[in-house]
Regions:
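A detector for short, charged/polar N-terminal pre-domain segments
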Residues: 1-13, 70
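Major-groove DNA-recognition helix of helix-turn-helix-type DNA-binding domains
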Residues: 17, 22-58, 63-67
Length: 72
């Protein structure tokens, strides 16, 4: 399923780590490293599983939008 089709779903849906990685164009390993360092969107730990709320992933991406390179 394409990222565009996934993003049209319920924003409060908890998504898999692999789905979050696909939406953010990152590897699952990168998300794992980010969790250790406290970077990245908030996540939910349910048993051994890690989940992300779709809307929080999108909000996290939107918060990093830059108008030009000097803003970084």
């Amino acid at each position: 399923m394409s990222v565009e089709a996934q993003m049209g779903r319920d924003p409060d849906q908890l998504i898999l780590e692999t789905q979050a990685a696909e939406i953010m164009c990152q590897s699952v390993r990168t998300l794992q490293k980010w969790r250790v360092t406290g970077f990245g969107p908030h996540f939910y730990k349910i048993g051994r599983s890690v989940r992300y709320k779709r809307s929080e992933v999108i909000d996290w991406i939107d918060a990093r939008r830059m108008a030009h390179t000097s803003a970084a």
